[in-house]
Curated annotation (Swiss-Prot):
Keywords: Nucleus
Region (Disordered): 1-29
Domain of life where this protein originates: Eukaryota
Name by which UniProt lists this protein: Testis-expressed protein 10 homolog
Length: 933
């Protein structure tokens, strides 16, 4: 075989037969094995460096995984961070900076599950950290939120609104400070800037045009509703978090009600703190004429303005600039939505649930735009601008079919399918769709009445075509007997207030107030609703009474004022807050001399000041003070009312200071005080005046004193030779309360013109009503011993009957004084009264000494007599009076010494003899000195 043929054999292929396997090559690799992946769910760590998750991952590992390329790893890291921080709350604030920065960076992540987990973690962190701790990191959060809201991806824009919800819920104040940027972002979510040079700006549609995106999971109208709902919430936060300045209407409750209020800044002063004159009081703070100074210092430069916003919304001009961009978009949105609704129904006033929610958000935004201005005068400028710019559009698009109702659409049952996935995306739409027609109609009324200018008759005539339906709607809504919620009622009352003030018509005023009064007269209203109606009528009368005569002459308002005392009697202590609100109106109305109120107040005075169940004793202290102050304006004080007031002062159910104020008020209303007015009507008769003061002086009425005479002896200090009267001991609180009352009674009686006549009246009253009593309360005895010396005239001699009764009272109180060991204040008061009477009333001390008959005393009473005499002798100012009756004193001591004539004497007798010898020697020394000179 040739060499050439051999070479061909080397490259010749082996032909395989069908069904035979190819033989393996000599260098073939055996692949008969299986491989498995190694999965490490947790770190293999032996030493614990800090808190970890159940997978043994610490916070550094979790934060590092947030930068992983795999979405599942990032989502697991976010879940792990929430687990770690919830198990260790102290780590939240410790790692707040890095956690917030990393979470904020994931707002724009391309994976939806990662963004959702980031929002859940942000919500958890926001619940744990207060706003002051987040403030340093909030610019970063706001920047990432802006990136998400302006992102090209529709899904990221939708997730950005959920981030906005979290920040609005937990940090509204911080978020509202970034409104210059975020408001422009809202515009870009639903619109885009028109191209310049196309001529579209001249058509009045604004510089922005609505956009329609087909890539979203919801319709364009649903997306706009979602954005407008967040925009409304954001504007609400901006308005509420803005610091309240002078002249701005109150944002709590009914913002319109405080519009006409003066700009005087009140200064609260507690006079008790300035009794000694050590502190200075600034009575006026510019009287409201100058604005409060605010510091212009900033920790960081202001943020750059966003799209559509060049300056902060702090003036009418800046708000107008933003409104000029936003309002045309809102009108265009509503025209588009309303056009689609008319295709389905011929009734333009019936709206679908989605259109109803859309209109409500549009109207809410319009209302909030007006409240963006910080001062009252700028609000008027903004209202005028809205009227000139958009009144025609509002009447055409909003008022044409007013009022609106809900269109009921039959819903067919659909099979459950994968559409549930769209539920989270349209969550904002669902939240904004639950709007009642009443809320939409009321909000529309609020927006429209702000466009009516006040004080211009020709303007009012021009506005009658759209103000008339509003007035009819309000009247029917308030008068149909349905119970309204506090939110809807507050909005309706705001509209009523505005229409009453602007139209200045007595017919319109009575018509609207009659509707409100019908709502007010309903029974079983909630406390919030009742309080709201009370505040409306009260502020309408107090603030607008003098500025608007048509309000002052309203018959409905007069009828409401006349019903207040009756309501106060019926309400009582069942609701102290509502009673306090009633009194806040009754007092200024009484001060202004409202005849209807004063007549009703006079008619129900005895019920209001009833000592058992009246408002003056069952309400809190502040309300009690108002009731006492109202007495100053009461037309008359009949005897029945004075009896109630006297018992109120004596029962102790009001404080001593308040009882003092009440007594002084009655005193000033009497002609005897010399301070009453020169009018012919006498509010208080002299007889009733003196009867009131005598009853208050005694502390017990005649019926109560009569009942004490039949009281069991176990509750009394029995009468004896040294205590001629049976004493009824009162409690310490009652005694001290009555002591303070006695002081002011004595002061008032002491200021009367003729003291002799006053004392004669009091003397006859004591003799006729008290002298024949056997059982006398201790406070009554002390009151008489305190009052008689102060009222006794030098040239007037008291009667023997009065002196003997005072002697019995003094003896009984001296005996009681020795038994008062625990109460020092009561003992001091008793001794002060006894000393004043013994040292000032002529012959009283002699009668007391004459009643000390040693031979008639038992052995147990002798020490008591000795202690009384020692007490009288030890007092320096009584020594001269005692020595003036030295013969009686010497006779008593001789009888005591004769009774104990033995060598052994009791200690009480030794003390008495010592006091007597000291007093006698001192008196003789003084007499010797006078003889020398």
């Amino acid at each position: 075989m040739s060499k050439k043929r051999k070479r061909q054999d080397d490259f010749q292929k082996t032909k395989l037969k069908v069904g035979k396997k190819k033989p393996k090559a000599d260098n073939a690799t055996n692949v008969n094995f299986r491989s498995k992946s190694i999965h490490l769910p947790e770190q293999l760590k032996h030493g614990e460096s800090g808190p970890t998750t159940h997978r043994h991952l610490d916070i550094k590992d979790l934060l590092s995984q947030l930068h992983h390329f795999n979405s599942n790893v990032k989502q697991g890291a976010l879940v792990g961070l929430r687990e770690l921080l919830s198990a260790n709350p102290t780590m939240v604030e410790l790692h707040a900076s890095v956690v917030l920065s990393e979470v904020a960076a994931l707002f724009t992540d391309k994976d939806g599950s990662v963004r959702a987990a980031a929002v859940r973690l942000l919500r958890f962190v926001a619940q744990c950290i207060p706003s002051e701790r987040v403030a340093p990191f909030f610019p970063l959060l706001s920047a990432h939120l802006t990136c998400a809201m302006t992102h090209i991806s529709e899904a990221i824009q939708e997730e950005a609104l959920r981030v906005l919800d979290v920040l609005l819920e937990h940090y509204p104040g911080l978020l509202s400070q970034r409104h210059t940027v975020l408001l422009g972002n809202f515009l870009e979510l639903i619109s885009q800037r028109r191209k310049s040079g196309t001529g579209q700006d001249k058509s009045g549609k604004g510089s922005y045009a609505l956009t329609v995106t087909t890539n979203r999971s919801v319709t364009a109208q649903q997306w706009r509703l979602t954005v407008l709902l967040r925009l409304s919430n954001f504007l609400q936060a901006v308005v509420e978090e803005r610091p309240l300045e002078e002249g701005v209407s109150s944002r709590i409750g009914l913002g319109m009600w405080a519009v006409e209020k003066g700009l005087v800044t009140p200064v609260d002063v507690t006079w008790e703190e300035h009794v000694n004159g050590q502190g200075k009081i600034q009575l006026f703070e510019n009287s409201g004429a100058g604005p409060t100074s605010h510091s212009a210092y900033r920790l960081r430069p202001d943020s750059k303005s966003g799209a559509g916003m060049d300056k902060e919304l702090c003036s009418a001009e800046t708000v107008q600039g933003f409104a000029a961009t936003l309002v045309p978009l809102l009108l265009e949105i509503w025209v588009e939505a309303a056009g689609g609704g008319r295709v389905q129904t011929d009734s333009g006033h019936l709206l679908s649930a989605e259109s109803m929610a859309l209109m409500f958000q549009i109207l809410s935004i319009l209302q909030l735009l007006r409240r963006m201005t910080p001062q009252r005068d700028q609000q008027d400028v903004l209202d005028a601008w809205f009227r000139n710019s958009y009144l025609t559009d509002f009447k055409q698009h909003f008022m044409k079919n007013f009022p609106y109702g809900l269109l009921e659409v039959a819903r067919h049952k659909k099979k459950a399918d994968g559409k549930r996935i769209k539920q989270p995306v349209a969550a904002g739409v669902v939240a904004g769709s639950t709007v009642e027609p009443l809320a939409v109609n009321v909000t529309l009324c609020q927006v429209m009445v702000t466009l009516s200018l006040r004080g211009q008759d020709h303007v009012a005539a021009e506005d009658a075509d759209w103000l008339g339906p509003i007035r009819v709607f309000i009247r029917e809504t308030l008068s149909n007997g349905s119970k309204l919620s506090s939110k809807h009622l507050a909005a309706l009352l705001e509209v009523v207030w505005r229409m009453i003030v602007t139209q200045r018509s007595r017919v319109v005023t009575d018509e609207l107030l009659q509707a409100v009064y019908v709502q007010y007269q309903q029974r079983n209203l909630s406390v919030n609703v009742r309080s709201l109606l009370l505040r409306f009528f009260s502020q309408l009368y107090i603030q607008e009474h003098q500025n608007h005569p048509h309000i002052a002459r309203s018959r409905i308002l007069a009828r409401w004022l006349a019903s207040l005392p009756v309501q106060l009697v019926q309400l009582g202590s069942r609701n102290p807050q509502l009673s306090a609100q009633l009194l806040e109106t009754v007092q200024p109305a009484a001060a202004r001399g409202n005849k209807d109120l004063l007549q009703s107040l006079q008619k129900n005075a005895c019920s209001l000041y009833d000592p058992q169940e009246g408002c003056v004793v069952v309400l809190p202290v502040e309300s009690q003070k108002r009731l006492v102050q109202i007495l100053h304006f009461l037309p008359e004080f009949p005897a029945e009312l004075l009896a109630c007031l006297s018992e109120v002062c004596n029962t102790g159910r009001v404080s001593a200071s308040l009882a003092t104020t009440l007594i002084r008020t009655v005193h000033l209303r009497s002609p005897l005080s010399g301070c009453s007015s020169a009018s012919q009507d006498v509010p208080l008769k002299d007889v009733d005046y003196l009867s009131f003061f005598f009853t208050t002086l005694t502390g017990f009425s005649s019926d109560m004193l009569r009942a004490l005479q039949d009281k069991d002896e176990d509750d009394l200090l029995a009468a004896s030779t040294l205590s001629p009267l049976s004493v009824y001991t009162t409690s310490l609180d009652q005694f001290l309360h009555h002591w303070d009352v006695v002081e002011v009674v004595c002061h008032c009686l002491d200021t009367l013109g003729s003291r002799a006549q006053c004392f004669d009246v009091i003397q006859n009253a004591i003799i006729n009503n008290l002298a024949g009593l056997v059982v006398v309360p201790d406070c009554v005895c002390v009151a008489l011993l305190r009052c008689v010396p102060r009222l006794l005239d030098v040239n007037f001699l008291p009667s023997d009957t009065l002196l003997h009764f005072l002697s019995d009272c003094c003896l009984s109180m001296l005996s009681l004084l020795l038994q008062l060991e625990q109460s020092a204040r009561k003992r001091d008061a008793v001794w002060e009264a006894c000393f004043a009477a013994l040292s000032s009333v002529p012959r009283l001390l002699r009668l007391v000494l004459q009643s000390f008959r040693v031979l008639d005393l038992c052995e147990d009473e002798l020490p008591v007599l000795a202690q009384i005499l020692s007490l009288l002798l030890q007092h320096t100012q009584l020594r001269n009076h005692m020595m003036a009756n030295a013969s009686f004193l010497q006779h008593i001591i001789q009888d005591l010494t004769h009774y104990y004539g033995g060598e052994s004497r009791e200690q009480w007798l030794i003390d008495l003899l010592y006091c007597y010898s000291v007093t006698l020697s001192t008196h003789r020394a003084n007499m010797g000195i006078r003889d020398i000179y």
